[in-house]
């Protein structure tokens, strides 16, 4: 029979064992993945709809996730549904705020199209400063293709503006809410 102190020692030895910690982390990971399944399913359905050319269905699937501020959904909706000139739902005034919110919260893929929107003044006020800032942030986080674009936009800024934009990029912190 197990008495209190002996049972306590057995439980304590289990809790500190590497195997238990591994199983606990694995269990938490499974719970996290299982709870994310509805979001993943919504993204998967939206991508299938976009591949089929059904932007209305893609928008419907993504809007549910956008309301939850899922940056992946914001990026897909902003880039491929509203930001795509070939889409019947093309509207840069809807695309830019989605990309901005995703980028401000750290979604790196949204930063390059957002920088392009600022450079061209489409959906947001034209600002080479903001364009450079977002490209510099993207480059700092190793976004592919950002270096060439950064150099190109940098040539459009005066030296003092360039330094201010670099400083703004370095000082930028991602929003958490």
Where would I find each of the regions flagged by the language model?
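Short helix-capping/linker turns of helical repeat alpha-solenoids
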Residues: 53-54, 67-71, 83-85, 104-107, ...
């Amino acid at each position: 029979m197990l008495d209190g102190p002996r049972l306590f020692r057995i439980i304590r030895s289990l809790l500190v064992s590497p195997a238990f910690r591994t199983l606990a982390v694995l269990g938490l990971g499974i719970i996290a993945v299982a709870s994310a399944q509805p979001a993943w399913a919504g993204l998967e359905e939206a991508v299938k709809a976009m591949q089929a050319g059904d932007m209305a269905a893609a928008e419907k699937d993504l809007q549910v996730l956008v309301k939850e501020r899922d940056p992946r959904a914001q990026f897909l909706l902003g880039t491929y549904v509203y930001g795509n000139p070939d889409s019947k739902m093309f509207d840069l005034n809807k695309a830019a705020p989605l990309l901005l919110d995703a980028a401000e919260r750290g979604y790196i893929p949204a930063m390059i199209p957002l920088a392009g929107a600022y450079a061209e003044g489409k959906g947001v006020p034209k600002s080479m400063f903001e364009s450079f800032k977002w490209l510099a942030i993207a480059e700092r986080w190793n976004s592919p293709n950002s270096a060439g674009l950064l150099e190109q936009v940098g040539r459009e800024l005066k030296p003092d503006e360039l330094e201010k934009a670099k400083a703004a990029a370095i000082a930028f912190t991602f929003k958490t809410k």
